């Protein structure tokens, strides 16, 4: 079983990650030295706990987002993905292939004036009751 982390450890680690994300690594010893440099942590065990939790969060951040931590790099990446516009629309097709039954249905619904409809022959299947290998 793991230990319960206090609110102090969690808050300190999150703040350190948000401010110094580029300096932190996935290595505990490196993160311990960085925590020692950038923050005034009163005791050695508390410093180790904060560095350990920061390392834990960095490993989680490698795979996905962590709730409560907003990193500018991730926000920029998310914004870039949201604003992406493809050069060729996936919805625009010049030719729509339909079989004769679908063409008749479109005529009945008064959609026979759609541009780009191309009549194709339906693919024939073996039918029912046949032997399967």
From Swiss-Prot:
InterPro entries per record: Ribosomal_eS17, Ribosomal_eS17_CS, Ribosomal_eS17_sf
GO CC annotation: cytosol; ribonucleoprotein complex; ribosome
A GO molecular-function annotation: structural constituent of ribosome
Pfam families noted in UniProt: Ribosomal_S17e (PF00833)
PANTHER family found in the cross-reference section: 40S RIBOSOMAL PROTEIN S17 (PTHR10732:SF0)
Family statement: Belongs to the eukaryotic ribosomal protein eS17 family.
Name under which the protein is recorded: Small ribosomal subunit protein eS17
Taxonomic lineage: Eukaryota, Metazoa, Ecdysozoa, Arthropoda, Hexapoda
Underlying gene: RpS17
């Amino acid at each position: 079983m793991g230990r319960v982390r206090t609110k102090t450890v969690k808050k300190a680690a999150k703040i350190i990650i948000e401010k110094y994300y580029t300096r932190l690594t996935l290595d505990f010893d490196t993160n311990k030295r960085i925590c020692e440099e950038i923050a005034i942590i009163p005791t050695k065990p508390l410093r180790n706990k904060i560095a350990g939790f920061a390392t834990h969060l960095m490993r989680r951040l490698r795979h996905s987002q962590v709730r409560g931590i907003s990193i500018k790099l991730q926000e920029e990446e998310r914004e870039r993905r949201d604003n992406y516009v493809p050069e060729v629309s996936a919805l625009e097709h010049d030719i729509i292939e339909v079989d004769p039954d679908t063409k008749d249905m479109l005529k009945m619904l008064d959609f026979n004036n759609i541009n780009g409809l191309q009549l194709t022959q339906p693919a024939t299947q073996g039918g029912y009751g046949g032997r399967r290998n």
